[in-house]
Amino acid sequence: MPTLLIVDAQSVKNTDTAGSKGYDAGKKISGIKRHIAVDTQGLPHAVAVSTAEVTDRQGALQAMTRCRANLSTIKAVLCDGGYVGQPFELGVKQTLGNAVEVQIAKRNELHKFAVIPKRWVVERSFAWLEKNRRLWKNCERWLNTSLQFVHLAFLALVLRRS
């Protein structure tokens, strides 16, 4: 069982047939967001799909709340700068327990590109999702359908590796 979760969100553009639409003003994308929490091997332990206007913090808490029963061994949650704030930390502690530590991975002050240790694991998981053509853009009418296709993509990945 994992003791560290790495959390991130990905904005995905909608097609014209998509039912749920939102706008992510930060990335200027009209579509949905996928929120995932992965272990150190990149396998998902909490997944949520929301409209794009939902903040990263709210979506991560939604994913952790949905999968709370499977996250009893978590001791730390590693996030990027989009998850800074006392309300998120409090929400994680209420959902996963007071012993859980929220760690924010800080960027370099010079704003140069640098790979932040352990953060690349969640980005690699998003890259694995992008290998599935159906997940390049959101064309589903319901968010739950999109969520199930994310689950199927990770399931297919695990089955290919075993």
Enumerate the predicted regions with their spans.
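Polybasic low-complexity intrinsically disordered regions
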Residues: 1-98, 103, 107, 153-154
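Basic, amphipathic alpha-helical segments enriched in Lys/Arg and hydrophobic/aromatic residues
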Residues: 90-93, 97-98, 112-162
